[in-house]
Amino acid sequence: MTSTQSRTLSMLVDGEWAPAASGATAETVSPATGEVIGAVPQGDRSDAQRAIAAANRAFEGWSRMTAFERAAKMHAVGDVIERRRDDLARTLTLDQGKPLASEAYDEVDELVEYWRMAAEDAKRLGGELPNSFSPNKRVLLVRRARGVVGVITPWNWPYTMPAELLAPALACGNTVVWTPAPTTSVCAVALAECMAEADLPPGVVNLVTGPGAEVGDEIARNPGTRAVAFIGSTPTGRMVASAAAGKAVVIEMGGNGPVVVMDDADIDKAVEATVAACFLCAGQSCTAGERLLVH
């Protein structure tokens, strides 16, 4: 998206772009201009269930690939992101509001690195094996992917936070059902378009937009998801952890980080660093400084 021209968006389920089953949409507005920039599908539980079923069907083929085969697919996604760098950065500014030059391009560049890092790390998964207790026996380690991973992501870093969860899960052979924050669904669709353009197999990544109370809750509770990964607020994280009880759960919630200034600090540099720590991304970051402790 290179202008404020509004468009009707779609969800990605089983390799196909489609509206919500109900046909419902909601307007999303640019915080930079106040203009409507898209009509976002309002998925519900049935859409999430359809996506989970697609991810389960895709799991066997994806997980049976070697790490090197999956890495090649992951690098292909990185290639598409690099080609679409300008478009992705502009979309981020329109949808989320980050300044184009100082923050949006940086986030897109980080996005590429997340994909490439996960691709390479998956080739090198290591670990120690104990010696066999018998000369006639050999100890082997067989790694198996967990299954379908539900991914729920926030609005403040709408490219890098999804990549932080999506890329490692995919590189290790899992398939994914992803629902983004409703306020930055345009960015989510743009990232999903990159994955589709890179020819990830149908059903390996599924994007379902809509209210978290329905879509996110279904992803967390549905027995078809074997793990749930969440980044977001503490109250929502607690609800996700409760809904996903009994599954593997990875949760990153809001922090309460102080900025500590020691008595031997360079005050000018400390002030500059404190402003950056507290107000990067308008202060909407889990690592943002919330208190100032001066020695």
Task: Locate each region found by the language model.
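Generic hydrophobic/aromatic pocket-lining and core-packing "Φ" positions
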Residues: 166-167, 216, 237, 271
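Residue-level signal for inorganic ion chemistry
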Residues: 34, 70, 92, 173, ...
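Periplasmic-binding protein-like
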Residues: 167, 226-231
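A structured beta-alpha segment of the ubiquitous adenosine-cofactor-binding alpha/beta core
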Residues: 138-139, 206-226
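Conserved small-residue-rich beta-alpha loop and adjacent elements
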Residues: 128-202
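ALDH superfamily catalytic-core signature
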Residues: 227, 235-295
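Glycine-rich loop-to-alpha-helix module at the N-terminal edge of alpha/beta enzyme cores
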Residues: 35-125, 136
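Terminal low-complexity tails and localization/encapsulation signals of metabolic enzymes
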Residues: 1-40, 72, 76, 127-152, ...
